[in-house]
């Protein structure tokens, strides 16, 4: 009995096709482009982030993850509400080939535990 079917890939990708590569190319081409905004929880003020600033932050976080022993293929659990920092960590994971595994603040304790057990 057939238990698993893995179809041939519809197309191939390269390192130039990753979300990190897209960010990197954009930052190199137009570093001053507005790419994100975030709101300070205390002051409620909005802050602009340029492509160059975001790339620098992503690279810094990626280096920190590497320093913690994260490498290509590692799984990194991100427990956070949706925010700018979540995106930075997600891009940093992509930059080093790690897999980001989100746990959302709306997930129940049981759901979160199940996700962590799988990792």
Language model segments and positions:
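Conserved loop-to-beta-strand segment in the C-terminal subdomain of adenylate-forming
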Residues: 31, 72, 100
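Sequence-pattern detector for short linear motifs
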Residues: 6, 29, 60-62
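Conserved AMP-binding/adenylate-forming core of the ANL superfamily
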Residues: 36-91, 108-113, 117
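Flexible, non-catalytic linker and terminal segments flanking ANL/adenylate-forming cores
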Residues: 1-19, 39
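Structured binding elements
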Residues: 97
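Short beta->alpha connector loops at strand-helix junctions that form conserved
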Residues: 103-106
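A short N-terminal helical cap/helix-turn-helix that marks the beginning
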Residues: 14-37, 56
């Amino acid at each position: 009995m057939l238990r698993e079917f893995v179809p041939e890939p519809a197309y191939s990708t390269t390192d130039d096709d990753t979300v990190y590569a897209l960010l990197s190319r954009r930052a190199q081409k137009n570093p001053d482009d507005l790419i994100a905004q975030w709101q300070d929880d205390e002051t409620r003020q909005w802050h602009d982030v340029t492509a160059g600033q975001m790339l620098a932050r992503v690279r810094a976080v990626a280096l920190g993850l590497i320093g913690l022993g994260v490498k290509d293929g590692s799984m990194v659990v991100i427990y956070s509400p949706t925010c700018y920092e979540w995106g930075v960590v997600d891009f940093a994971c992509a930059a080093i080939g790690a897999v980001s595994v989100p746990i959302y603040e709306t997930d129940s304790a049981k759901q979160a535990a199940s996700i962590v057990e799988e990792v």
